[in-house]
């Protein structure tokens, strides 16, 4: 019996040892599994967190895309340009008169009336503004002069003469920057307000709130900023390359463009720095008058278009 008992004990011990070994091997195998120790509850939590993070990421991306596209459309920069067809007929612009009107902006007047609206951009004074003013006075024509800071600083007496002779002075910004690159209202306001302040110091009166974008560069947000500041924006429907001091057009070249492309309701842009303009303006006004045109002011244009 004892012998049997010993053998039985040995057998049981051997079986138990084998069983323990198998359990250990099983534990080792289980511990090596990649998902070892992760319960169903933990899996559920991770899955929920993943879905939440994915949803938030998708929402953020969609919002960023939407804002990006909106900003791109809103901040799109333009250079004002014109397309001419038949001589004597109004051109087409980058934007239509109706599209510009919602920003209190204009590029042409009433195309059924033989009226010209004469404007000058004044970047600096080089001796040509005086003969221009003399010609305007001779023909009793009132024009609008868009001035920058430099012109106000260096030629205050010329500005006073403009006002005394019934002309309008508008805002061409202080530093003649590419305003389409400005997205801040504070920066936009400073460029226009510095002109306002200096003009009032010189003349004792507020500047007329007419704005012309420097270089013809603009964006829709710029036009809205100008409107929010109480300005009316004026582009043009007739101009020619008259601003290069070392490459001035001849009298014949100037007349070809300015007589051939004149049209009813034209807002004409000339530069007061042009030697050619200073020399030909008297004769040019005479020729336009002989063609049956009269001259109006921008405030008349704006009031008719309102």
Regions picked out by a protein language model, each given a short descriptive name:
Residues 128, 177-203, 217-264, 279, ...:
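Alpha-helical scaffold elements lining the catalytic groove of polysaccharide deacetylases
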């Amino acid at each position: 019996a004892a012998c049997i008992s010993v053998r039985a004990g040995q057998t049981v011990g051997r079986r138990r040892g084998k069983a323990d070994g198998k359990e250990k091997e099983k534990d080792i195998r289980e511990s090596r599994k990649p998902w070892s120790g992760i319960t169903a509850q933990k899996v559920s939590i991770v899955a929920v967190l993943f879905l939440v993070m994915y949803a938030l990421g998708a929402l953020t991306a969609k919002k960023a895309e939407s804002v990006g596209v909106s900003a791109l459309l809103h901040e799109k920069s333009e250079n004002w340009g014109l397309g001419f067809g038949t001589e004597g007929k109004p051109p087409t612009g980058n934007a239509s008169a109706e599209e510009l009107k919602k920003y209190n902006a204009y590029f042409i007047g009433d195309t059924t009336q033989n009226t010209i609206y004469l404007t000058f951009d004044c970047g600096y004074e080089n001796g040509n503004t005086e003969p221009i003013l003399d010609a305007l006075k001779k023909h009793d024509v009132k024009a609008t002069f868009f001035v920058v800071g430099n012109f106000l600083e260096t030629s205050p007496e010329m500005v006073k003469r403009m006002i005394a002779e019934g002309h309008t002075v508008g805002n061409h910004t202080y530093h003649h920057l590419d305003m389409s690159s400005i997205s801040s209202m504070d920066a936009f306001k400073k460029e226009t307000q510095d002109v306002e302040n200096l003009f009032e110091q010189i003349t004792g009166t507020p500047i007329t709130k007419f704005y012309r974008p420097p270089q013809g560069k603009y964006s829709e947000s710029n036009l809205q900023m100008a409107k929010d500041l109480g300005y009316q924006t004026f582009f043009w429907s007739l101009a020619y390359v008259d601003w290069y001091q070392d490459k001035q057009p001849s009298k014949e070249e100037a007349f070809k463009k300015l007589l051939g492309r004149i049209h009813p309701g034209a807002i004409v842009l000339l530069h007061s720095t042009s030697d050619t303009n200073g020399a030909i303006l008297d004769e040019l006004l005479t020729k336009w008058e002989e063609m049956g045109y009269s001259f109006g002011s921008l405030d008349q244009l704006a009031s008719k278009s309102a």
